[in-house]
């Protein structure tokens, strides 16, 4: 498909997808115009003076909307360690309230991922984070194309769940000691097109 997109007589290429695919399309487009809507890996930073309830609400809407399948959704949470326990407890409590099921049911908050393969990829990413030392505080289970809203603690900035975009309902928490450390962690992802 990529060959047909790049090699055709179209005047402009427009693609939505992963950063890797976007880089490939851009590198082969020659002098043709390219518009790319690529994945993101957006942090939500919660500093010690934050309104914790508002921050939790930001995660609930940003990490779990459309089962976490939003390119500009919250993909990692960077929290000052002085408020991390309170923030994490509230986030876990709210996450446990999420009803997963048929999206046609008005009470359902979390539906399926795009397909079972996507849910397996999220499951693998979370399992790898756990093997590397992360702890599942709630969620972490897959049933077909469903994947539970998941909160991960003990996450480090070098884990795949942080470095790469996890396209599912996962909220990895990274604790920091200072504002400077929080800011430095916002930049620790794979390179993207700017």
Identify what each model region corresponds to:
Residues 144-147, 164-170, 188:
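Conserved glycine-rich beta-strand-loop-beta hairpin in the small C-terminal domain of fold type I
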Residues 128, 162-163:
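Conserved ANL (AMP-binding/adenylate-forming) active-site segment centered on the GW(Y/F)…HTG consensus within
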Residues 20-156, 178-180, 184-185:
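ALDH superfamily catalytic-core signature
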Residues 1-7, 12, 187-194:
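Single conserved hydrophobic/aromatic residue that forms the stacking wall/gate
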Residues 8-9, 13-22:
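Active-site phosphate-binding strand-loop segment of PLP-dependent enzymes
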Residues 174-176:
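Short acidic-hydrophobic, aromatic-tinged amphipathic segments that line or gate anion-handling sites
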